[in-house]
A protein has these predicted regions:
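Short, solvent-exposed amphipathic alpha-helical segments in soluble enzyme
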Residues: 23, 136, 176, 198-201
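Short, basic, helix/turn surface patches
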Residues: 61-72, 206-220
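Flexible, glycine-rich phosphate/dinucleotide-binding loops
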Residues: 45, 191, 238
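A short, N-terminal amphipathic alpha-helix
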Residues: 28-30, 42, 214-223
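Patatin-like phospholipase
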Residues: 2-101, 133-141, 186, 194
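Short acidic, glycine/proline-enriched helix-loop-strand junctions
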Residues: 191-215, 225-230
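Active-site-adjacent alpha/beta core region of enzyme catalytic domains
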Residues: 74-188, 221-246
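Intrinsic-disorder/low-complexity, polar/charged segments
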Residues: 14, 72, 109, 197-203, ...
């Protein structure tokens, strides 16, 4: 019986940078996936990694993260906040994130990735939606569409939002796709924060990472004992907000 391995990338805002170091460590020890699954910021990292699943690709991803600023991802202004109060919608324009994706991604369709790639998004009904073909940029934008912050993205007639809402740690999907060995690249959470982040989006992202951590533990307990599951250790103590791109 063939043994398939999957890398599962979780969400977590700017803490997604931690996954770059995890990838470097895994590859240096000869651990390679047969396919990858990602949700939220994990979808972004999974998509880049699937495009170049080697040390050189990880080095490229590291350079992207090192050059990233908060304004590149969350271009929020006073005018946008006032506009939200007057006309409820979303706070940030996803244009910056789209430009980031299109400037660095070496392919345009998910099915063109060198290794199989699966992106998770959430439907309006709260169901997990798997994206494995079609425009890569749209899939990433859908999976990272944090409610209120970014607008939902229409794909195949459905308005989709952040994959972390329904399936932030999609280990069950990895198992359904045939993985018997699952390596989870979790972003962790700011376990050493003494008080919540001051900015509203920072607080929302911090709450999301706390939810992700508990969701991860719960999902592990529900998986079959026949699966070989490894969760890459996260950083703790950690006092960096998932909204901090410094």
């Amino acid at each position: 019986m063939d043994t398939k391995a999957a890398f599962v990338f979780t969400g977590g805002g700017s803490l997604g940078a931690i996954q770059v170091g995890m990838l470097r460590a895994l590859l240096s020890h000869g651990v390679q996936p047969d396919f990858v699954v990602g949700a939220s910021v994990g979808a972004l990292n999974a998509t880049y990694f699937a495009g170049a699943p080697n040390i050189e690709g990880v080095a490229m991803l590291e350079r992207i993260w090192c050059g990233l600023r908060r304004s590149d991802v969350f271009p929020i202004s006073l005018a946008s906040v006032i506009g939200l109060l007057r006309h409820p919608g979303n706070i940030a324009d996803p244009g910056g994130l789209r430009r980031l994706i299109e400037a660095h991604l070496p392919y345009t369709k998910l099915e063109d990735a060198p290794i199989p790639l699966n992106i998770m998004a959430t439907s309006p009904e709260g169901l997990a939606v798997r994206l494995s073909s079609g425009p890569a940029a749209e899939a990433i934008l859908a999976s990272t569409a944090i409610p209120v912050v970014f607008p939902p993205v229409e794909i195949d007639g459905k308005m989709l939002m952040d994959g972390a809402v329904a399936a932030n740690t999609p280990m069950r999907l990895a198992a359904e796709l045939g993985a018997s060995r699952i390596i989870v690249l979790s972003t962790g959470y700011a376990c050493a924060l003494k008080e919540p982040p001051k900015r509203a989006i920072g607080r929302a992202l911090h709450a999301l990472t706390l939810m992700i951590n508990w969701q991860l533990m719960h999902e592990v307990e529900q998986l079959s004992d026949d699966l070989d599951v490894h969760i890459v250790p996260t950083l703790c103590p950690l006092a960096v907000s998932p909204f901090d791109f410094s």
